[in-house]
Amino acid sequence: MHKPRTNTNVLEINQSLIELMAEWRISEKDDQLIFTKIVGLQLKKIRLIKGFTQTRVAKAINITFQQIQKYERGQNEIKSINLKKLSEFFNVSFDYWIKPILDANLTFLTRRRENVYPLKNDIFMER
C-alpha cells in the first residue's frame, strides 16, 4: 500500500501536468520547456508510485541523484539513452514519458504540410 503522502504527491503532479498542458502552443520555445517539464513530472510520478528514491534511480542508470532532481524539475532535458534506461528500469513503454501529451492530442507542428516535401520514410524538409 502506498503512503498517503505519495498519493498526495501524485495528485499534485497530475494537477501540474494539466496546468502545463494548458500553456501549450504559446511558442515553440515554451513548448520545448513544457515538454521537458512534462517528462520530468512523469519521472517523478513513476518514481514515487514505485517507491524509489532519487539516489536509487540515479544509480540504476549511472547518473547522479542531482541529475534526477534536475530532470524532475524540468531544468534539464533527459537524453534519449537515459529515457530508454529509465523505461527499462521502471518497466514502462517509451511513450509513457509523453503520455499526457498524447492523451491531450497536443501537436508540435505549426507549419502547414504543403510547406514541406517528403524526403524519405515520413521525414520532411522545409521548402
Regions found by a protein language model. Give the residues of each.
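General nucleic-acid-binding
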Residues: 1-24
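Short basic helix-loop element that most often maps to the first helix and adjoining turn
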Residues: 3, 12, 41-56, 85
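Short, charged recognition helix plus adjacent turn
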Residues: 7-12, 99-127
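A short, Lys/Arg-rich alpha-helix, primarily the initiator
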Residues: 24-49
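Short alpha-helical DNA-recognition segment
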Residues: 51-70
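Short, conserved catalytic or interaction motifs in soluble domains
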Residues: 73
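DNA major-groove recognition helix of helix-turn-helix/homeodomain DNA-binding modules
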Residues: 81-96
